Regions:
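Short, well-ordered beta-strand elements
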Residues: 70-79, 103-105
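Immediate post-signal peptide segment of exported/extracytoplasmic ligand-binding proteins
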Residues: 4, 52-74
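DNA breakage-rejoining catalytic core of tyrosine-based enzymes
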Residues: 44-52
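Short helix-loop capping/hinge motifs at secondary-structure junctions, enriched
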Residues: 1-6, 48, 66, 167-170
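Detector for C-terminal structural segments
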Residues: 9-43, 81-91, 113-231
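Generic alpha-helical secondary structure
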Residues: 3, 52, 83-87
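Short alpha-helix C-terminal cap/hinge motif
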Residues: 90-104
Length: 231
């Protein structure tokens, strides 16, 4: 997994559309980059579409033609039936398309967090929900030594873009150009593999008005009101 060609091959052999439609079934959105699309008007690069043929070439270049001599590798996930189903599906995809063997390990939440924090894993399932609406909230996770960077990955060029260049820009348009350049590095190096973007389902009574959906799923309660005109 120290070889980025292997990491990219793994990313290219996850069929995200099949995963979201047939396994998750909750309206989740296939993710082809680290940042959700249209986060404050930012659109990330889209370079991770399902491509088993390219993945096989990358594995061969890395010294593992048709999966030969590739060591059995582990996927760690916290105990949850949904996470188990996703892990099993990815395990099967990698076996079918790359002919590699994957071992699944589940741990209770606190044990799992310790394993991830200590780097005691090979591949680990993880998730992130943004605290505020800005692509920086997803991209600054992967700076060298960052508290949320549990990958062991460190890239000085990436850090410079996120920590030095982007903050200098006064407009979102110029900041987003820097973020796009940084995310290109992230996708090329592939320390993490984006799979899908969370969605939320809400039951809303027809009398509730002025509920404006937003990416954080946070209602502005001062703007809500009830109407007697039921639809």
């Amino acid at each position: 997994l120290k070889d980025r060609r292997v990491r990219r091959a793994l990313a290219l052999t996850i069929d995200r559309e099949s995963l979201t439609e047939n396994i998750l079934k909750g309206g989740q959105i296939p993710a082809y980059a680290m940042t959700p699309p249209d986060t404050k008007g930012y659109f990330p690069p889209n370079k991770l579409e399902f491509n088993p043929a390219e993945a096989k070439k990358l594995m061969a270049l890395a010294g593992y033609p048709d999966g030969k001599n590739f060591p059995e590798t582990e996927i760690l996930y916290n105990t949850n039936e949904g996470h188990r189903k996703v892990a099993v599906a990815i395990q099967q995809m990698w076996k079918i398309h790359l002919n590699i063997d994957i071992r699944l390990t589940n741990q209770e939440w606190k044990v799992y967090l310790d394993s991830e924090s200590n780097g005691d894993y090979e591949i680990s399932r993880a998730g992130w929900i943004g605290d505020y609406v800005d692509p920086n909230n997803f991209l600054d996770m992967f700076i060298c030594g960052g508290g949320n960077n549990r990958t062991g990955w460190c890239n000085e060029d990436y850090d410079k873009l996120i920590l030095q260049e982007a903050p200098k820009k006064k407009s979102d348009q110029n900041r987003f150009a820097i973020f796009l350049e940084a995310e290109e590095i992230l996708i090329d190096e592939m320390p993490v593999i984006p799979i899908y973007t969370y969605t939320s389902k809400n039951l809303v009574h027809s009398s509730l008005k002025n509920l404006n959906p937003n990416i954080l799923n946070q209602a502005s309660y001062k703007d809500l009101f009830l109407s007697d005109d039921l639809e």
